[in-house]
Structures are given as C-alpha cells and as structure tokens.
C-alpha cells in the first residue's frame, strides 16, 4: 500500500469497524474482538480486516466470533460507507489474525533458548575453557610424516642460496 489515500482509507475503516464492534454490535457470539489491521485493494473495492479474539484460546469461541462477524458484515459495510462518504463502499472480508499465536510460540522458543544458554553458562564455570594443559610442546617426529623432500617452491625454513 504505497498510495497514501489507500492507507488513509484503511486506517479509517479500522477505526470505524472497531468502534462499531465495541459500541453497536451486541451479538452474544462475538467475543472480545480486536481489529489488528486493515488492508485495502488498490482500487478500494475490497477491504480485508484482520482481527483477533483475545482471552479465548479454544477453537469454538473463534468460530463463533467469525460467524458473528460474518452476520454483521452488511451493517458494518453500510456504516463504513456512511462514515467514509465514498460512492462505492469496499466489500469487507474478515480474516483471523494468527500473529499473536505466532508471537507467543516465538516467545516460548526464545525462553527455551535462554534457559539452555543459562544452563550452559552455569556449566562453563565448573569446567576449563580449553585443554587442561594449554602450553605447546614439541611434537615427536612420526614415521608416518614424509621427510623434507626439498621440492622446488617449497619453503623448508633454510635459504638454499647460501
């Protein structure tokens, strides 16, 4: 939505629908619905309204709220048309917003990662951070290692020109 006019229409639709749900729609199936976002098509003929049902985690309450919103769609559309003063009011589509559930799952994953980090940090205090003897010692010459063959282009630490 790069068009500022479309963005203003979307913001106004969000305010009008939220006020209508709070004050004028008295459907008992409608839970505590919060309008989180509104997206309007470029020709302002369709508006997608994202909502959440707060305080109720069961699927039955979500379904009941969705049915209540669908039944109030005509009243909401006529009020949006009246408030916006547009010749053609956009058709409204209600979509349950999954963002709060995703955010909660992400918070749980981050909390588990933090607990694992704290457990690792507690374990680091009891163990050495590396080898028990960190000092370098000369390695014994193994029979498996090839001798210095003196291949040209290979540096053996001795200058051959002298």
UniProtKB/Swiss-Prot annotation:
Keywords annotated in UniProt: Cytoplasm, Ribosome biogenesis
Major place of residence: cytoplasm
Domain of life: Bacteria
Taxon lineage: Bacteria, Bacillati, Actinomycetota, Actinomycetes, Propionibacteriales
UniProt xrefs under SUPFAM superfamilies: Ribosome-binding factor A, RbfA (SSF89919)
Region (Disordered): 119-162
Ranges of Basic and acidic residues composition bias in the record: 133-142
GO molecular function terms noted in the UniProt entry: ribosomal small subunit binding
Protein's recorded name: Ribosome-binding factor A
Subcellular location: Cytoplasm
